[in-house]
Swiss-Prot record:
Belongs to the helicase family. It holds the Pfam family Helicase_C. The lineage of its organism: Eukaryota, Fungi, Dikarya, Ascomycota, Taphrinomycotina. Its main location: mitochondrion. This is ATP-dependent RNA helicase suv3, mitochondrial. It catalyses: ATP + H2O = ADP + phosphate + H(+). It comes from the Eukaryota. Its EC number is 3.6.4.13. Required for intron-independent turnover and processing of mitochondrial RNA. It is a key control element in nuclear-mitochondrial interactions. Residues 166-303 form the Helicase ATP-binding domain.
Amino acid sequence: MFLETLIHGVTFCVPFFSKSARIHTLSKDVFQQRKFPGNTLWAAALNRFTAYLFASKELSSKQAYLAQDFVNVCKDASVFQNVYYYELKKNILTDLGFSDLKNSDKSLALSKSSSTFDLQKIKKIHDCLLSEYRKYVRYQERIEETRPDLQKQLTDLKNPIEWYPGARKLRRHIIMHVGPTNSGKTHRALERLKTCKKGIFAGPLRLLAHEIYNRLQANGIACNLYTGEEIRNDYPFPQVVSCTVEMCNLSTTFDVAVIDEIQMMADPSRGYAWTQCLLGLQAKEIHLCGEESVVKLVRSIAKMTQDDFTVYRYERLNPLHVAEKSLNGKLSELKDGDCVVAFSRKNIFTLKSKIDQALGKKSAVIYGSLPPEVRNQQASLFNSKSSDENILLASDAIGMGLNLGVKRIVFSDLKKFSGVSTIDIPVPQIKQIAGRAGRHNPNGSKQSAGIVTTLYQKDFAKLNRAMNLPTKNLFNACIGAKDDLFFRYLSLFSDDIPQKLIFDRYFKLAKTTTPFVVSEGALSTFIIEYLDHIKGLTIKDKIKLLGCPVLKHSKYAPLFIREIGCVIAQGKRLQIYDLKSVPLEILERGIPTTETELQQLEQLHKLIVAYMWASIRYPAILQNGAAEKTKAIAEAFLIKGISKLQK
């Protein structure tokens, strides 16, 4: 079966499996749902198991600690998708033959045999948990007893400066360009980059790396592009390389390097990439663009590396003001050039529907799960005077990497869901988003002042306070595991021990010195669990796949990572349409007509990008041709789908 789609005058022909052959096994997985009877039984059995454990006089203090740890993670397995315990839960419920998982708790409770049935199941689950806990204790004891002295040596991360001997041989000059959004700091650094013989730009986003690549090429500068998902070697000897920070080349010598958003080095999930760029780049001049909050931290690191250090400070090119009042919830007061900021995809589309109805016009949308190419298209619509999309609905994704003709930022809320709980938006993030107001004028005319306000009065005082708070200094630079040491550490242990437990032990033992901290976010540890027990997959392959850009809570992630791991282990050459874990049948629907279909297409696009990321690292196994075509089709459908929803 083939899907034919016309995009920009080119017909793509992509083979697909039949829907019946490509149903994703996890799409029917109900174990993550909280209201199903399987979870009711699980919770009851877990309570019984907990009571048994902590009533036992045989438990040592060490085992009591492990018991509490085991119970906590079992309890949260369905919420946080901790694979080791999540699989335990799923397997136990499945093995017990409890197949009637689609009925609600209420209907189960009303069934005649429910009370007897529940008691039997609870007892069996309790027994399985007890057996599993004993295995868990044995795993922990084996980990702790395996070469403890060598474990301590391999987790000693106290001197990351010495990890980069090539950079230590150079007398580098670190030059900081510090200022708020729209102060010209990055422009100044890029002007220096244009004049060097050999340079590199490293930024936080693929979209930004593309923008610099296109801009430099338009200026006649030979520039290549390196991102996690795409490599463009247009020139054998480029003057400049534009890349994302994770792809920064630390083994080549440059005259000038520019690292954007250097304050991100304190970020728990990706900060390690900025820190390793700062410590490891072999460049005579390193220009760092960022916020005042990171100056003291970088200065202290420059002193440790014995590099020269200079700071240039910049003021905004146009003023930024907080409005006199909020909009008091009146959508009719929104004007052309406004950007309404919401912190979830659901809230963005809810607001979009209300705003489009209230104003009788379409609005553009930008949020994190949209592909960069689609975000760029929506930004162009918003910036264009000939377009009808004169109001923008956006998430915090607008904080970096897009040139937007925003006149006024309107916060719809100052809270967001962190993945665990609802939190206040951090002050630096509020300031960064607010700074987008008045940031860019696509026509090159004089820039007007930027205005920032809130949609509702309840948030207005909080916004005022945030905008007037002084900058707080950052004190920590995140580092990741050193590859060779981490490889040796993982190699110490037997293959039958769940690698998640080994990872937990590694981070527990890891030791650093100020200002460096180890970031667990530097390793997508949930991925390692999907790769457990794949025959023929080496430890080096597993470490390499830890960077695969799949979302932790994606229902497609487990099967996708496992299938990629198996393919690599077997050395089997294939195209993306050969993978059962990639639901390409979504493309058969054509252009999405509902928000649900749009979201499903976004999830498919992320899987395609993850495949392309893996194909760059395993080009002899994972072929890229069909993936590039399906990616283009998905992006075209997304653009047209958003356009349909805007009508």
